[in-house]
Swiss-Prot record:
Subunit-structure text: The 20S proteasome core is composed of 14 alpha and 14 beta subunits that assemble into four stacked heptameric rings, resulting in a barrel-shaped structure. The two inner rings, each composed of seven catalytic beta subunits, are sandwiched by two outer rings, each composed of seven alpha subunits. The catalytic chamber with the active sites is on the inside of the barrel. Has a gated structure, the ends of the cylinder being occluded by the N-termini of the alpha-subunits. Is capped by the proteasome-associated ATPase, ARC.
Pathway: Protein degradation; proteasomal Pup-dependent pathway
Protein known as: Proteasome subunit alpha
Keywords, ordered alphabetically: Cytoplasm, Proteasome
Intracellular or extracellular location(s): Cytoplasm
Organism of origin: Xylanimonas cellulosilytica (strain DSM 15894 / JCM 12276 / CECT 5975 / KCTC 9989 / LMG 20990 / NBRC 107835 / XIL07)
Amino acid sequence: MTMPFYVSPEQLMKDRADFARKGIARGRSVVVLGYDGGILFATENPSRALHKISEIYDRIAFAAVGKYNEFENLRVAGVRYADLRGYSYDRKDVTARGLANAYAQTLGTVFTTESKPLEVELVVAEVGDTPEADQIYRLSYDGSVADEHGHVAMGGQAEQLGKRLDDGWREGLTLTEALDLATTTLGAVGTDGQLLAAGSERTIDAGQLEVAVLDRARPRRAFRRLHGAALTHGRGAPHGEGAR
């Protein structure tokens, strides 16, 4: 009689984690960092139709790396969660922490029970009335949640990019300084996905960037995208989604 094939739980979880990490590492990195006027999101994304950075609710935004169809489904679910909670209770009851907890449950359940884990990594951020009140949560493929302070990098070479953000970030950055730091950090990864030496960073064309902010000064919907001159010169009036 043929013996049944056995895989230990430890090996099964390790294989799932390795599978998810490889899928995430193939995606282009996303960086999120706080500045004096809010929270900045930036990634290299040549597509004008497929967004990796999106608005979720009034003062909450979402960024992701990995398989687009998987994190897009999570984004839509997050919007529905926020809309339903805001409608059923109060708009102030919709928080990044609550959304992060909901995502963590979904990611953790899929990781342990489904045939394959989701190949995604997420950031959920909420801008507060002051920089100290800003919230940035990073969610991994297995449902683990990290409360980040100031900045975070996701995707291929995330650890090395995080160290570069550590070196360049400080409290009270202006939007121009934050944008310069974000684009320089993203440019530290070559087109082949390998980390470049310090001082040899690529200059990413503005048309290849997807950048958005949660603007603390906006009265209700804080999310807006940065385009054109605002990216080329690191300053200027942003335009786009969320403007009212």
